[in-house]
Structures are given as structure tokens and as C-alpha cells.
Amino acid sequence: KYLSATQRVYCFGQGGSLVIAMEAWARFITAAPQFQCIEDSHMQAMAAALSTPDDVILFFSYSGATKDMLDVLRPARRRGAKIILVTHFAKSPAAAMADVTLLCGSKEGPLQSGSVAAKMGLLFIIDVLFNEYCRTNPALTEANREATAGAISAKLL
């Protein structure tokens, strides 16, 4: 529901979670132009500071407890943006700020950062969100997917 009724969806993450946020953006941009990914944490903070109640922050963070992440989520929360957090920990500082918390990932220690098992769970959540988005917005997503597929197929030799 949040992803469909929005002006912008920012896909954010830091460190290894940024790669997952970029994957989410790459998947959604084929069907929904309102999805954006900002890689730099300073730029993420600025976008959050200008967010509106019509925006959604889709934040990926295994721990849900990093300073940079909270520096993004606090202003977004103050400005009324919806926050969807994808994390491993239900009881984390970020989960306390989120409108929706999606739990995923296998257990990993600090020396296992970015394990394949944890990433597989995150990719599965992205796939479920994307497929549900397309299912609930068929007219828009089918036309956009055809247009983006055409743009990419033109690049094939």
C-alpha cells in the first residue's frame, strides 16, 4: 500500500546494505519511475530532510542500528515520510522509527558482514515487494516494463 500511493520512494542503505538498496532500485525502476536510489549518506540525509508525507523511505539495514542510518531516518520521520525498514532485528533503533518493519536474513556476526545467506533473504523480500507492486498496479507497471524492456533490448547486438 505504501509503495503504491507515493510521490517518491527512496531506496537507502549504507555499507553492504547499500548494494541491496541499489538492487531494489534496479528492480523497481523497470516498472515505477518514482523509485530512486541515493548512494551517498550525506545526500540521503538531505533527501530525507526534504521528504514529505507523500514519500516513502525503503531502508535496508541488517543491524537497524547505525548512526548514519538514524541521521537519515530522524528527519524523514519528523517530516512525515513513511518508513519501511528491512532488517534482521525487530528491536532496533530504526525499527522503533519505522511504519513497517520487514524481518529477514540469517544470523551473522560482525566479521561475516554481507554474507550470501543474509543477502538471499533480502533479495527474496525485494522480489516479493516488486511482484506485489506489479500485481496491484498492472496498468502502470505493464506499460512501464514494456518501455524499459524496449530501451534495454535496443542495446543488444
Spans of features found by a protein language model:
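Glycine-rich phosphate-binding loops that contact phosphosugars or nucleotide phosphates
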Residues: 4-124, 130-137
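A short, charged, Gly/Pro-tolerant segment at domain boundaries
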Residues: 139-157
